[in-house]
Amino acid sequence: MKPSVIEILQKLLTYPSITPKECGIFDYVRSLLEGFEAIEVEHEGVKNLLLYRCFGEGEHWCLAGHIDVVPPGEGWSVDPFGAELKEGYLYGRGAQDMKSGVAAMISALAKIDHFPGTLSLLLTSDEEGEAKWGTQLMLEHLKERGFLPKVAIVTEPTSEERFGDTIKVGRRGSINGKLIIHGKQGHVAYPSKCLNPVELIAPRLAQIAGYNLDAGDEFFEPSKLVITDIRGGIEAVNVTPSDLKILFNVRHSTQTSAKEIEDYLHQLLQGIPYTLEIKPSSKPFLTSRESVVVKRVSEAVKRVMGVAPKLSTGGGTSDARYFAQFGVEVVECGVVNDRIHALDERVALLEVEALERVLLEALG
């Protein structure tokens, strides 16, 4: 008898799979999906697994996620790897992010006996860390084999207050920057002999801190330049600093590029000595609301939950961005995310069961 989606999740939660440890989860998953072929790619201690089954000559649809979790830390009221069940909730590190999604994908795939094309499950043990040798590497491998999926559904925890209220059809990009304003150190009593970088940047700071680089649109919030750190000087009240360093991040839409951010700052900082470094971390992407996968998942959520989901691009980055970079139409749909990475992380059993039904509807 096949285990239920809840039983699968309980088992997954007992594995202490802190990035990049896989802890034997892949063997367990393979035992649940008989009849699926396997492709395994391991690099630098990171394990990746693709299980696939060809039902017909149609499109390749992939369900994807990660089995690694962040460290639990101290202060839990339960064993973070004990999979304790209390009052309709399962507790454990990864309950929401994202072993609930993994369990739902496994359980759904185990129940499907017909599909017009190929179905696959892609799992990685490197998403919560650098994500350098995880999904991205696996997709490169699949591209070399001519086996990239046409469509992907990533079961990250996307819901905000109630399961199904939000699905992700894109993500903002992330750009990190470092700006150093160069001055000349000196005694505060002799300002004519100093060049104070604080005074140089002060009139321009309001056009950097919290500045909206675009107006946003239906799917993306404005691309905001957010200062995360400012420091300079030697903690002496009578010495002006030689340099002032500003660190910043921009979570940006498809309307604003790294080049445009760089051009804006160069224009703003004309006339003062500075050094600027811009480093893109991830690119933004948007899957069309008219794409088959967005329509399928949206309609599935509406049938199961009775409410049409909001299409969002908010939140941080996820492995969905890698699918988009390889030209795969991707959407994210998962449980409520109110306790991800938090103490006493938990997930409602009803949400996990509903997610499985959504996947079955979307793939049916």
UniProtKB/Swiss-Prot annotation:
UniProt cofactor(s): Zn(2+); Co(2+)
One of the record's GO molecular function terms: metal ion binding
Active site as annotated: 68, 127
Entry keyword annotation includes Zinc: yes
Disulfide cross-links: none
EC number: 3.5.1.18
Free-text cofactor note: Binds 2 Zn(2+) or Co(2+) ions per subunit.
InterPro entries named in the record: Bact_exopeptidase_dim_dom (IPR036264), DapE_proteobac (IPR005941), Peptidase_M20 (IPR002933), Peptidase_M20_dimer (IPR011650), Peptidase_M20A (IPR050072)
Positions contributing to Zn(2+) 2 binding: 97, 128, 341
Annotated catalysed reactions: N-succinyl-(2S,6S)-2,6-diaminopimelate + H2O = (2S,6S)-2,6-diaminopimelate + succinate
Alphabetical GO biological process terms: diaminopimelate biosynthetic process; L-arginine biosynthetic process; lysine biosynthetic process via diaminopimelate
Sites where the protein binds Zn(2+) 1: 66, 97, 156
EC category: hydrolase
One of the Pfam families matching this protein, by short name: M20_dimer
Residues spanning the membrane: none
Keywords: Amino-acid biosynthesis, Cobalt, Diaminopimelate biosynthesis, Hydrolase, Lysine biosynthesis, Metal-binding, Zinc
Known pathway: Amino-acid biosynthesis; L-lysine biosynthesis via DAP pathway; LL-2,6-diaminopimelate from (S)-tetrahydrodipicolinate (succinylase route): step 3/3
Subunit comment: Homodimer.
Its job: Catalyzes the hydrolysis of N-succinyl-L,L-diaminopimelic acid (SDAP), forming succinate and LL-2,6-diaminopimelate (DAP), an intermediate involved in the bacterial biosynthesis of lysine and meso-diaminopimelic acid, an essential component of bacterial cell walls.
Family from the record: Belongs to the peptidase M20A family. DapE subfamily.
PANTHER family, per the entry: ACETYLORNITHINE DEACETYLASE, N-ACETYL-L-CITRULLINE DEACETYLASE
Protein name: Succinyl-diaminopimelate desuccinylase
Gene: dapE
